[in-house]
Design a protein with these regions (language model features):
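Conserved beta-strand termini and adjacent loop/short-helix elements that scaffold enzyme active sites
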Residues: 47-49, 77
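Short acidic/polar alpha-helix capping motifs at helix-coil junctions
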Residues: 52, 67-73
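Short, well-structured N-terminal submotif of metal-dependent ribonuclease cores
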Residues: 1-46, 55-66, 90-95
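Active-site neighborhoods of divalent-metal-dependent phosphate/nucleic-acid chemistry enzymes
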Residues: 71-114
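Short, catalytically relevant binding-site loops at active-site mouths
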Residues: 50-53, 81-83
């Protein structure tokens, strides 16, 4: 079975209220359709960072996001993940202002997620 890592934006699109911006609302619809119709075809992973990010903000919205991820497999962070995340930032592949984005990429790559 192929695998996929989902980061917090995906969870927010699944659990969030429909956004008033038509472009964002379309992204939400497409993401929700994928989640409903296709996600079961994959081994879906998250990380502790996703749980931390999902826990932030409005308590009701956070509870909805956490409900989405509660049964997903958790990837473990490691020194290799941290080193790759740092390398992505050093190489300017990910902006230095977005270290969590570098972490999301690194944890999926190091753990061999498709």
């Amino acid at each position: 079975m192929d695998s996929v890592y989902i980061e917090t934006t995906i969870v927010g699109h699944i659990a969030g209220r429909v956004h008033p911006d038509p472009l964002v609302a379309t992204r939400q619809r497409v993401t929700r359709d994928w989640w409903r119709d296709e996600a079961r075809r994959y081994e879906v992973f998250i990380s502790q960072v996703v749980i931390e990010e999902c826990s932030q903000g409005d308590p009701s919205a956070a509870a909805e996001r956490l409900e989405v991820v509660k049964d997903l497999d958790l990837l473990e962070a490691s020194d290799d993940v941290d080193e790759l995340a740092d390398a992505l930032i050093s190489a300017k592949a990910v902006p230095a202002s977005e270290p969590r984005d570098a972490f999301h990429i690194a944890i999926a790559a190091v753990n061999g997620v498709d």
